[in-house]
């Protein structure tokens, strides 16, 4: 599997009741989205995107929001002058799921188009 394989996938609804990915499983998927980092004992996936100004960061955050709404899998987004921080976690399982990596790959693809 590579990042292209991840972007071809759709998020599947997570109803909870399943275990989150282990740190080892998350590390294997992280290889496909190398600009992202695991945080909080491998329960979150985070990347900070850099921009020339606040409005570019705000526009990117809006595009990420639209993408995530279409997939039904929503990140925590933080913006400030020259940056947009995107953090995924599957809240129903309090950890990471393949959906988080699918969305990270799709956000990377969106950033490459910007």
Curated annotation (Swiss-Prot):
Family as reported in the entry's similarity comment: Belongs to the pterin-4-alpha-carbinolamine dehydratase family.
Protein name, as recorded: Putative pterin-4-alpha-carbinolamine dehydratase
Organism: Methylococcus capsulatus (strain ATCC 33009 / NCIMB 11132 / Bath)
Classification via PANTHER family: PTERIN-4-ALPHA-CARBINOLAMINE DEHYDRATASE-RELATED
Enzyme class name: lyase
GO annotation, biological process: tetrahydrobiopterin biosynthetic process
Enzyme Commission number, as recorded: 4.2.1.96
GO molecular function, one term: 4-alpha-hydroxytetrahydrobiopterin dehydratase activity
Pfam (any one): Pterin_4a
